[in-house]
Structures are given as structure tokens and as C-alpha cells.
């Protein structure tokens, strides 16, 4: 397991964690170093995780395209990118084209204590396309959890990993609930 300190100190790490749930059903979580620190917890709670330190929105788009070519895109895709580089409207539109009209794109707002902006494109896209995009507002949620972060104010301590996992889990589970008759075990999702 990679700790948040390892993720922060050892950029270059990539974590691909299979989901603990049903194959092909698990939400896919694509992220950068923030998600990298929480990858193990996310995979234990039903997500297929692909996280890489310093991953850019463009690299995330390339990953989605490669998975589409392989026919390996689930119905729900969670994207948590933009800690280092802002996500643009163009990036989001490219993701939507790759995912098509039947999948849901869940966008996580990045939290940067030193830079309180950079979530505008994500928020606008979620408002404009509520049927296809769901906002997961980590930026707002994280403001109340100073103790969740290491000294850089961005990467997660264990308590932050739990809060981050809970937020993503609750958002994805609310989307999955109707498909599995409300049974979290059938959807491969456990409580955080």
C-alpha cells in the first residue's frame, strides 16, 4: 500500500487497483497524486482506480480513449485531475465525447489551499450538463479539514484519505443505487 507520504515524496508512482466489486460494474476512478494516496481505500470500497502522480487532464483523456478502444469503460467514471494543471472546458468536452451519452462523468473539484480558484470549468460543465456530469465538490468539503492534509496542504493524511474516499463513494453509490436494488454488496460497494 502506498501512503500519502509515499505518493507525495515519490512522484512517478502509478497505482492501478482492481475494484473489490463486480467486474465491469465498478466505477472507474482516474486521478493524480491526491487520489494516489487514497487509491487503496478507494479500491477497497468498490472503485477501479488508476492514479498517477502529476497526471494532467490530457493524460487522463488519453487513458479514457485507450480504455474506450478496449471496450473497458464502465457506466460511471470519476475524474479527479487538475491539482497541478487546471481542467478546461475543452478537456471536459473531450471526456464527454469519449464516454458517450450513456455514461456518467463525475468530476472532482481539486483542492489547493494556496490557490482557491481553478474549479470554474468543472462547476460550469456540471451546471450545463446535469444529465451527464455530476460534481463531486472536494474543494468545498476539504476547506473544513485542515488536519486531513500534510504540510503541503494538498496531499492526504490517513484521515483525509477517509474523508476523500467517503465523498467519492457516496457520490458514486448514489448513482449506482437504483441499478442494484439498493444492495451495496451486489454493487461491490461497502460503507466507509
Model-derived regions: residue spans:
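Long, well-ordered alpha-helical scaffolding segments within enzyme catalytic domains
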Residues: 94-99, 124
Amino acid at each position: 500500500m502506498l501512503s500519502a507520504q509515499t505518493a507525495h515524496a515519490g512522484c512517478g508512482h502509478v497505482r492501478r487497483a482492481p475494484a473489490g466489486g463486480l467486474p465491469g460494474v465498478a466505477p472507474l476512478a482516474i486521478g493524480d497524486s491526491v487520489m494516489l494516496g487514497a487509491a487503496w481505500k478507494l479500491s477497497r470500497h468498490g472503485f477501479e482506480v488508476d492514479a498517477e502522480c502529476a497526471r494532467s487532464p490530457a493524460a487522463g483523456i488519453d487513458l479514457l480513449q485507450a480504455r474506450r478502444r478496449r471496450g473497458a469503460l464502465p457506466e460511471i467514471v470519476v475524474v479527479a485531475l487538475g491539482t497541478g494543471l487546471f481542467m478546461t472546458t475543452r478537456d471536459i468536452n473531450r471526456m464527454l465525447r469519449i464516454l458517450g451519452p450513456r455514461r456518467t462523468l463525475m468530476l472532482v473539484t481539486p483542492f489547493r489551499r494556496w490557490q482557491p480558484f481553478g474549479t470554474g470549468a468543472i462547476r460550469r460543465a456540471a451546471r450545463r450538463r446535469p444529465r451527464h456530469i455530476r460534481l463531486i465538490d472536494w474543494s468545498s468539503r476539504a476547506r473544513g479539514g485542515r488536519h486531513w492534509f500534510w504540510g503541503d496542504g494538498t496531499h492526504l493524511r490517513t484521515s483525509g484519505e477517509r474523508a476523500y474516499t467517503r465523498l467519492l463513494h457516496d457520490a458514486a453509490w448514489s448513482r449506482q443505487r437504483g441499478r442494484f436494488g439498493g444492495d451495496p454488496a451486489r454493487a461491490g460497494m461497502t460503507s466507509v
